[in-house]
Amino acid sequence: LTRALEIYIAEFVGGIIVSKRSTDIENLNPDHVLSFNYSDTYEKIYGKEKKIKYDYIHGKANINKNVKTSNLVLGIDEYLNDERKDSELEFLVFKKFYQRVYKSTDNDYLNWIDRISDEYANYIENKNNMLESYRNSHNSVMKHIYLVSAKEKIPKHNLYIFGHSLDITDRDVLRLFI
């Protein structure tokens, strides 16, 4: 069934010619795209000639794959409470988290999150150092330099979500970004 969906997406959806574009999306210049979709629609329509890193977290439809090599993830949410989820494993293979691991879908997004966290930690550390230097300085010119440096803005990372149902089955990934 999953392979049939993959063929449909790769052949039919992939063959649709798009004549209209959203200028709102077109004017974005992302460095990274985390796709929960199986098709490369965004990449084909908006990502041409841009240096964007893509991560297809639920796999990417590919006509050249087969039943064994297909990495599309179709799954359910963890619906059991904490006591039962580790002991009742009969539906484990249907859960999205398990399938993402088992099918080795992309997880580059974890590196992206680490980089954002590191940038923020460095920003905070630099701010603390500047403020400490400001407090300890007796030279008014240096105090001014430290104060101006302390006003440096926090690194900005924008998150745009489109084409996603925001279903609870993907909350583990979305929570990392939000």
PLM region descriptions:
Residues 1-139:
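Extended, H/D-rich, highly charged conserved domains that either
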Residues 29, 50-51, 144-178:
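SIR2/sirtuin-family catalytic core signature
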